[in-house]
Amino acid sequence: MSTLSQQLSQLGGGSTVDRTWKLKQHSKSLIYEPQVAQDQDFSFIHAVGVEGLRDLVSLDSRFAQFENNLFSDTSIDVDRYVQTQEQNDLLDKAISAFLSLIGPYLMLSPAVKALEWLVRRFHVNQMNAEQLLLCVLPYYDQDIYLRVADVIIKLPPLFVFLNKSKSAAQNPPRNLLIRAFSADMRLFELITEYIVGQTTTKTSYQRQLSFWSQFAIYGLVADKADPERMLEIYLPALAKLVVTIDTDCQIAAYMVLTVLGNKMPLNKEVFNALVETIAANWTQKAIKSGILCITQMYQQKQEPEVLPTSVMTALNKAGFQPSDVVALSQKYKMALFTLGYCMALLRNPDAANFKGLEEIISNTQFGSNESTFLMRYIVDWALAKETNTSVAALAAPVIAKWVTRGETVPELDQLELKLQTVFTEAAVEEMEVEEIQEDVDVESLVEQAKKAASQTTTYFSTKTSENYAELSKIFVQLIERGYTMDKFVSMFSSDIASLTFFARIWASPSPLLARLAAVEAAKTIITAAGEADFQNLIPYTCIALSDASQRVRKAAASFAEVLKSKQNKKPIWGVEKIYTNDCSYLGSGDVTVLLNALSLEECILDESFVIRQVSDMISKKKGYKSAFSTAVLAYLGSHAVSQEIIAIRTSLLTLVTSSEEPIVPTTKVVEPLYINPPNDLAYITELIRTVTDKTGIKFLESLIKNDSPIYDEVCDIVTQRLVKLWPTLKGDAHLGLFRFFVDLSLDKDVPFDSLDVLAHVDVPTKVFISLLDDCKVEQNTTSMDAPSDESTKRRRRSSSSTVRNLLQGKLHHIAERNLRKVSLVLELLVASKTTDDALLGPLFTQLGEILTLGTDSNLPIDYCQSLLADVLLNIIRANQHDGASIDRDIRVDIVVSAIRTASNAQIQNKYLLLVAELATVAPTLVLHSVMPIFTFMGANTLRQDDDFSVHVIEQTVARIVPCLAGNTDKVDMLLVSFVTAFPHIPQHRRVKLFGELVRALDASGTKDALATLLFLFAQKSAELKTARKTSEVSAIAKFCDSLFKLFDASKQLAVVLPYVTLVQELYAIIATDPKTKEKEKKTRRQIFLQVDKELEVSPIDFLVVLLESRILPLQAGLVQSPEALKIAENVLTVLIESQYPELLNVILSLLPLPLFVTVAGRLGSSVYKTVLARFSSGSIEEEDTKASDTLLESLHSLLKSTTDTGDLVLLLQIVETVASGFPKCSDALLVTCAGEAVAQLKNSDDDVFIQAVSVLSSLCLRLGARMIGLFPATISSVLARDSSDNLIALSVLALFATFIKRLPSFMVSSLPKIFEFALKCPADTDTRKQLFVVCVETMDSRVVLQTLCDSWKFVEGFENARLFADTLDLAVAEADKKQIHSKADSLITLCLEAFDSSLKLEANTAARVQNLFIKCLIAIVLKLNDKTFRPLFVKIVDWNTPERSTLLFKIVCRLQENLKSIVTSYYGYIIDLALEILNKASAITPALQRNILSSLYSSFRFDREEFWNNEERFTKISDALGAQFPYLTKVAPENSKLLIKAVVALCELASEDQKKQLNDMMIKLLRQAPLYGSRCFAALFNNVGEEFLPFLPQLVPQIAELLESEDEKVESAVRAELIPAVEEVLGESLDRYLA
């Protein structure tokens, strides 16, 4: 037979699928959990949405439009499932507008609230899911997306790729979206259309556009992209976005267009249309992005195209300048746009455009093909017929930029002729742009030429420059017109005039064709000339052979062949005629060698070949004789000196300086040119290259000193030349030049950077030594004053007269200049990284000078001192292995003085590092000065808190401390210095610093450094404690603990004995009489700080505390290190005989168990018991069985013999610890110890009793059944103990719990006594409950249930009753059905006993107890079947008495509510009792009436068997209920609602006749109890409605009568409740029936 609970579970399955679906749909919420959302009504949700909308309106007034539709009050009643299609279309339109507008605010709480209303009321998550997703998709990586995705029941088809992330409640990864957008063009088209629509309605926003552009670009670069389909989607959308006035829209479109233009092929029409559309529509803020877009779109072109006029107009209007092109080109690849822009500039060829063009070409990095294309384009434009000469001339500077970079095009020669110029920057700058008259005839030009040519004898003079300019111009025009050169040659008065003219043409900037014609004309003249040596033309022939044009070089080679044919002829042509000065000449043999060496064929092929050949000649390479080289150099140099035309002289100097290596005679050859050279950079450059010796260097110095327009460029060239010359100079030259540059650097008026030269050359050590000697103060001051003996005195001597002198204006200036000079020399030393030890003496001398200067004046010497320290450090470190050879130059006393006088901490640190390095090189020298160093460190450096200072201290300690090996006094002084400085050392630096100090002392062989240091801190701590400086004492203790941690166990234990020795010495000194103390003061060690008075705190206590804080690590160290263990044994050997028991105990507590037992055996029992306290911590891990057994035997003996309660507690704690911490110890010994613990249960001391109970609990867990023999004595002793003390009660409860948990079967007989103890003891409820829980979970349920049934008599008070009820409830739940069936009668009896006991309590307490046991009763009943429970229910009914009736019906009501229709028929056992009570109105109480009515209401409500439809039963109960209405008015009006609910529930069960019977009864009651009767009728119409309409004719007259009632409450109830209820069912007003 099934249980009642199983029957109950089969009920209530009446919910339809439709209702479940609607509930699930209603529970979908963006804000609330489903279980909360399903209970919310639409009014509440609407209020939330309206609140959100109001906040949105405050942010954006456009939201106000939705107050009257989506969020109106009438929207609460809108149901889109019953609306017409037209109504739903309007609703969708409003929803679409709202979703379009809400996008930017989705991260705000008001937006979520407003959207909540649309989801809950209009189901946008179903009906508008696609648009909702489009709205929220830009937030795909935010929490709002997860919320929206969660409420969408089914994703639209295009968004099914989001299903996985939706199911996992995770944001979709970026890669998923990229793949989806790339693979499904329909999806991307949908999103693109949505974005375009947003821009049309001006509701787009930055995040949305960024999202779209980002994934649009990903779609473009995807491998699966279909170009045609992409263009079909992209171009219309982009065209719409570009023309909007929204900046963000435009920028998003530009981003996509940039990629589109480079990814997809666009035809010319589409491309131009896009570019022009961009330019025509960009907003002010989008201009920069638009321009960048256009530049990148042009990169997809195959070749450059001129920018359209409309685009250029838009660019100009936007303020786009050529400088902007340059700036962009440095960041982006945009060469094709730049070319198109440059080409477009030529459309309007004015000066401004060409200036911009020049700026672009000068500052933009073009590729070779691009550069050639643009150059050819500009040249073709300039050569075009429609381009006149004056306009074409504007392009000359632009073309010159290319030519100077070595670029050219074939058409350039024609342009040079057209413009009558050569394309070099210099020539173009001098060129006058004027219109050349094309209509001038040749005859006129010839006449002008004849006139000009006849006026000059040589054109190598500056006096002929004007004539040359006029004639060269005519010459070019005649060439352009094809005039015969023979005729032109005949115009000159002499061959000197003609040849110098033509040589000047080809040797200076001229058009190519002019240069070519000049060479050929000269060849014609030479060929026709008579016998002569034309060697004066050889230098100019070399210039022609180095021409950039191969045609010119070929002509020059032919000219040279003619010269060869004229060699060895007499006389020399042009002597004293072509120059105003005479020059050197070559012998005929040398001329032959020179001409043959030129290798003309190679010259034709390589323009630089002739330069290399001349270089070989003058540098004596390739076997040329010295005399020949010298002659050639003198020959070329003299021509350069004699030539007055600067441009030609520059070319000639190029030949002179052709050698890469400096040639000494060069300077002498061209020396005349060093006087007042013109400010021509090319000329000065070549002139500087001629410098090779002292004379030339003087020229370079003059260039540096004299300002000029090209000063900066000249200085750069001078620097390069000096760096190159430096290795070839001799010592004196080095020193002189070095002094010049140092003095120059001191001159603030000269901007030349001397250090730039000196930093790039290797300066000999001797030069530095000489310079340092120059820097001595006495050297500089004696030049003004007579020498005196005082100046020869040593560094540290100064006098008042010296100070006065230094403070005098002039001498002060000299001292300041001297200091700057020293600094400069030292900077160079640092830069050169010179490490020659020869510098040590001068440097230390200079350091002494600087210190004296700083002491005797107010000059700043910090920088100079710092540099000196750096140099000295470099030298000492480089020469560490040569200490014996350099220690004679070392002056440690000066270094110490520098440390003590320095005002800057960093400088002090550097010199401390220097001392540290010196300690390695010369330890003996350092030792004499070590204490002043450490005294200074203690007062200064240790207080610094920077990393460099810490490094300095560490290095100083590491290097200097080894010098102290064996010197105890100095070690003591060192340690005292550090301890004294301790308060000033930054806290986070202390531990590392002192650790390094100890390690350094240990490494140097100093013994007991750590012990001495701790001893000093102990004295310091005692002193501070006396002064009541608690925080400082704490700081020392914390520091010493941290310092101690740095060392291993061996080192820590090794501290003890030397520390104790020091303490003993201290106490011995303190005990000495004052006179002896005074005598021994000078010989006493400095570490004994406090010897004049007794110490309030013993240093031993300091060590004890320190060791106690390290017990666990030390114990581990002893186990791991045999060395540490040996040290511990030695320490114990000494301490056993000492007077320091505390220290002895600490050391003993560190020992491993075997050693501990061995050592302890040698001590007295009192010490043994004290030391045993360490085992009470429970943290020992030991597996030595023999040692643990020995310990247990000792403990057992002590437990027997000890009577002191404190010792007993301690021993019992140790037994407990051993039992839990030593798993391998003997169980038999533990049992003997347990017996002793049981014996101690009878001890009168509570602490001993409690500890004994605790020990027995622990031993029970360990031994289990082995303790069976001790159980009777244990239980009896424990229960016999007075349990009024809370601690005792708690310990006993814990013991019982352990016994029950470990040995449940042995505790059955003791369980009643345990329950009694638990219910009576004063322990807190939670602890006792834990015991009951253990019992229920561990022991047999029958035993527990029976024990509970027998234990109710021990329950007193509510807390115990609740504890008992909770235990019973738990026990019932733990038991199975069979066990409950077997104890059912006893359990019901137990509940009835509890109910009886509750009746004796105060009302509220009684109700609480009754509720607890009714709950237990129901739990019991649920595990019973009907056959078992029915007799028990009868037993409960039989238990009833008049006093118990209220409780009985309360029980019945709760049973009805929990068991529902299963127990409806059970009401038959109590119906008579209920009727009897209800019909005796005088005997019923309000509580009894309430419980009866509640039970009836529950029974009516769950009646599924027509139990109450029985005529007799129905009549009796309806009459009884009717009888209660008059009673309500008199006694219990508070039960009226319950009575009415019961009547309505009965009516819902009734048949037609029974309803009529009930109606008749209620009509009568309207007269007896009109108020409650009318309310009852109102409830009936509200619930059974139409079924009561047939009885309306009977009711209407009664209503009319009640409306006339004098009782206002009755009239009000009828109007407010009854009439509306009737009208609601009737469907019309009652007025016409009541009229």
From Swiss-Prot:
Q: Which residues cross the membrane?
A: 1141-1161, 1288-1308
Q: Which SMART domains match?
A: BP28CT
Q: Name a single GO biological process.
A: positive regulation of transcription by RNA polymerase I
Q: What UniProt keywords apply to this chain's record, in alphabetical order?
A: Membrane, Nucleus, Ribonucleoprotein, Ribosome biogenesis, rRNA processing, Transmembrane, Transmembrane helix
Cellular localization per UniProt: Nucleus, Nucleolus; Membrane
Q: How does it sit in the membrane?
A: Multi-pass membrane protein
Q: Classify the source by domain of life.
A: Eukaryota
Q: Which GO terms describe its molecular function?
A: snoRNA binding
Positions of the UniProt region annotated as Disordered = 781-803
Instruction: Give a Gene Ontology cellular component term annotated to this protein.
Output: 90S preribosome
Which Pfam families is this protein grouped with? Answer: BP28CT, HEAT_HEATR1, U3snoRNP10
- Write out the similarity annotation: Belongs to the HEATR1/UTP10 family.
Quaternary structure and interacting proteins, as annotated: Component of the ribosomal small subunit (SSU) processome.
Q: What does this protein do?
A: Involved in nucleolar processing of pre-18S ribosomal RNA. Involved in ribosome biosynthesis.
Name by which UniProt lists this protein: U3 small nucleolar RNA-associated protein 10
The beginning of the lineage is: Eukaryota, Fungi, Dikarya, Ascomycota, Saccharomycotina
The gene from which this protein is expressed is: UTP10
